[in-house]
Design a protein with these regions (language model features):
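Cytosolic regulatory regions of ion transport systems
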Residues: 1-323
Length: 323
């Protein structure tokens, strides 16, 4: 769910997104590549040869608005938005490789009394964070206070600097703009960052705002439209498709699909499949074990394959794994 994904983003420090596959055992994490990141300025193939254990794969880069599906000769550059697939026990390692700094977040300030805000408050509390909820509507505040007795409910304007100032914000705080209005979410996040909050996440509906977020200092975003699109695509893809994830600044998709025993891919290596250039297989879940594959990995019936693909290559790729 979106609320669980928000907990993942907070836990992964400077990540712009974190999407779980295979019941949470495989994770796609995204973030802006730092200029000092170990992954920069060498082909990925060369980096892999240098590292004894390679438990993650760069699926794609978004550079200057263009999606680059990563391969061995791809060179990652500072400022790229990298999407990396890894196992859930190696998320910290993957984020360090792209230069994300882990943050010790202790308190979540949630702007808005929406259903998403409520679910997020529950998830953040379950994750051990102190929770503050800000909403302007007095009756809604009374409801929130009764529904979330462990949270501090503040009745006020989330964009008001005085309201933010009273909270004594600091680097261990994450602020989340989860109202139903894009502008309120963005402005509330900016005010909170100016008052010292360590991390800001904004909910938005207008996709055109995405390109502005990083420049404004907003660390991550959750899109209502993209969440709806993922649900719709999951329905449209059907078949053995388990999950579809869409992303804010690329039209590529990450798809989890179960391999059919009668499929063309079954009992063949990934290298032998000759997947389209716009496709990367980022992870496999097999009988309770998850791993990041390489070209020699042989696909088996019942495997859950997570692949990242450009729109033009999705149908052809999915057909390889289905009957």
């Amino acid at each position: 769910t979106a609320a669980k994904d928000l907990v993942g983003v907070v836990g992964a420090g400077g990540a712009s997104e974190l999407v779980e596959f295979a019941n949470g055992e495989l994770v796609m994490v995204g973030g802006r590549v730092d200029r000092d990141a170990p992954i920069t300025d060498a082909p990925l193939r060369e980096l892999r040869m240098r590292q004894a254990e390679w438990g993650w794969v760069v699926a794609a880069l978004v550079r200057d608005g263009r999606t680059i599906v990563a391969h061995g000769d791809t060179i990652v550059r500072p400022g790229d938005h990298a999407l990396v697939m890894t196992t859930n026990d190696r998320v910290n390692e993957a984020t360090k490789m792209i230069g994300l700094k882990r943050r010790n977040i202790e308190r979540a300030i949630i702007m808005g009394g929406t259903r998403l805000a409520e679910l997020t408050a529950d998830e953040m509390s379950d994750a051990g964070l102190s929770v503050v909820v800000i909403d302007e509507d007095q009756s809604r505040c009374r409801y929130l206070a009764s529904r979330h007795p462990d949270a501090l409910v503040v009745c006020g304007d989330p964009t008001d600097p005085d309201v933010a100032g009273d909270l004594d914000l600091g680097p261990k705080d994450v602020v989340m703009g989860l109202t139903g209005w894009d502008e309120v979410n963005m402005l509330g996040c900016l005010v909170a960052k100016a008052k010292g909050a360590g991390m800001a996440i904004a909910r938005f509906n207008r996709i055109s705002y995405v390109s502005l977020l990083a420049g404004l200092g907003i660390d991550a975003a959750v899109s209502s439209r993209l969440m709806a699109a993922s649900a719709i695509l999951r329905f449209v893809r059907q078949g053995q498709v388990e999950r579809v994830a869409t992303f804010s600044d690329t039209d590529a998709e990450a798809i989890e699909i179960e391999v059919a025993s009668e499929s063309e891919a079954c009992d063949r290596s990934l290298l032998d499949l000759k997947l389209p250039l716009g496709v990367v297989v980022g992870g496999i879940s097999r009988n309770g074990t998850t791993f990041v594959p390489d070209g020699s990995t042989v696909v088996r019936a019942g495997d859950h394959i997570i692949f990242f693909a450009l729109p033009r290559d999705i149908k052809e790729s999915a057909a390889l794994f289905t009957a």
